[in-house]
Amino acid sequence: MRSIRSFANDDRHVMVKHSTIYPSPEELEAVQNMVSTVECALKHVSDWMDEKNKSVKCEGDVEAKEEAAESNAKDQSGRTLCGVMRIGLVAKGLLIKDDMDLELVLMCKEKPTKTLLCIVKDNLPIQIQKLTEEKYLVEEHVNEAAIIIRNTKEPKLTLKVILTSPLIRDEAEKKEGDSVAMKDPPDLLDRQKCLEALASLRHAKWFQARANGLKSCVIVLRILRDLCNRVPTWAPLKGWPLELICEKSIGTCNRPLGAGEALRRVMECLASGILLPGGPGLHDPCEREPTDALSDMTVQQKEAITHSAQHALRLSAFGQIYKVLEMDPLPSNKSFQKYSWSVADKEGTGSSALKRPFEDGVGDDKDPNKKMKRNLRKILDSKAIDLMNALMRLNQIRPGLQYKLLSQSGPVHAPVFTMSVDVDGTTYEASGPSKKTAKLHVAVKVLQAMGYPTGFDADVECVSSDEKSDNEGKNETVSSISSNNTGNSTADTSATLEVRTQGPILTASGKNPVMELNEKRRGLKYELISETGGSHDKRFVMEVEVDGQKFRGAGPNKKVAKASAALAALEKLFSGPNAANNKKKKILPQQTKGVVNTAVSAAVQAVRGRGRGALTRGAFVGAAAATGYITPGYGAPYGYSTAAPAYGLPKRMVLLPVMKFPTYPVPHYSFF
């Protein structure tokens, strides 16, 4: 898995390359003016042709002239020219410098003929002169079934207007014998060109619906179109097949992608061999019959593109994407210092920079590890480490460490994970209530053993003290801490939250806030309120509604944001004076007898616990119990301890278990 920093570097190169191939504002304005002018002129040509046809039909017919206005309003489909639509690069927004082919489709009511093409060509310059003072050259190309329009000013632009009709496709799809074939006019335009124009219209509508909304898709398409223009190997893929591949590659990802990562994903798709013979092919979604969009490419062309994509993917993996884009490598956006971190990072005001390359070191000491350790000591002794947890810091010092899960012990409701890591032949172990916490403890041990002040000693002590208090059932300490936190200032609260964000977010009792809130209020729904930032710096805001109140939390991912929202709800509703209102506690009367007093205190401790401790079902006073052991309740999980029913005991049941202690030692693994 590549680091986020490498994707950010790819994003910078791709965006710089995109800025060099994107048309200038003057070029875009010229394109917009030319296309709008021709569209309006074609509308005037259509009106002129309709008026001419009506005047011919209505000569000498007074009644027909009176009904002309009504028929025009009722039957708009009677126009000879039905409409004009944008297709190709103009409709999809894929224009780049030196590749600005402008295309329009002129839809006709009947099958287009050479006569109709000449009429439109002759009248179009007249209508253009009425709209603008700019001069345009209008030419007819019968073989292309189109009219070519060129401007005389800079930048030089060419607009192609293709004539077609829906009747051509309908007739082509009819089977023999279904209907009587209509006679085509003798001067009918090229049928294949008209069909291609209809297909281009479908492609434009599909692209606007599926690809325009994908983040980075249009940018990647412009980059790849420039690649097709520069490299002859990629030329056969240019056009509709390239658009399909980009949409499928980027659209199948479950999250928005940056420009660099999206380009790499397209290259991965091509490098996997989907173009090669025997592969899945490329389905054309705009055709009724199953059609392969790659059918026009030869086997040799497919193999050449696959080989080129694999080479580009290797260059990108080694940080040389600038070679794929044919541009100069960009300088780093952060100035490197003599040490591994910049001055701003030492002061805690910036994020960590890239490591110093080994070849940059100067001195007699040739061991790069010793150089890095010496530099780290100089930095860490002068200032505290910036806001990074021990696991992230260790990964910067020794990247690629493998953490292993040694064991998982404890009951299901209170597991204990033991993780280990091997550093320079020495194995370090640590435990925690979760794998993440155990890994964090291991990282702290390794940093301490290597002689680096971690700044997380207080966190480790807090975690260990919380675990001890949980095991002993001393919830009084937790309640006092929560009450003290309630009385603290806003600055103290924000400082506490900052410390918590270094590692996994846990409640005062050491549990996951989402799990603990779910135990108190089941069936809660978390909603995503907002998602901001780039692909390498996301910011999510989640919201949860508890008892009619809404709580929000933010974080770099949805999991952390949910935990923050749940933690806010717990601190607001289930801590301090609010805890008594939301959760009623039943306190049993104190007894003065020895054994019974011990049993009562144990039951009270269990009731006060945060949920991990098991409540003994117990027997009624006076019930017989076997000597030598504690009477177990039903449902004890795996023999670790006795357990109460899943949904609590009856309210009036006497919670006084009869406990008889043996005269000989009880094995520690039997019931505790």
From Swiss-Prot:
Provide ranges: composition bias, Low complexity: 477-490
Where in or outside the cell it occurs: the entry states: Cytoplasm
**What is the native source organism of this protein?**
Gallus gallus
What are the GO MF terms of this UniProt record? Answer: DNA binding; double-stranded RNA binding; single-stranded RNA binding
| GO terms for cellular component | cytoplasm
Does the record bear Ribonucleoprotein in its keywords?
no
Q: What is this protein called?
A: Spermatid perinuclear RNA-binding protein
Here the segments flagged for biased composition (Basic and acidic residues) are 356-370, 465-475
Instruction: Provide this UniProt record's keywords sorted from A to Z.
Output: Cytoplasm, Developmental protein, Differentiation, DNA-binding, Repeat, RNA-binding, Spermatogenesis
Q: Gene encoding this chain?
A: STRBP
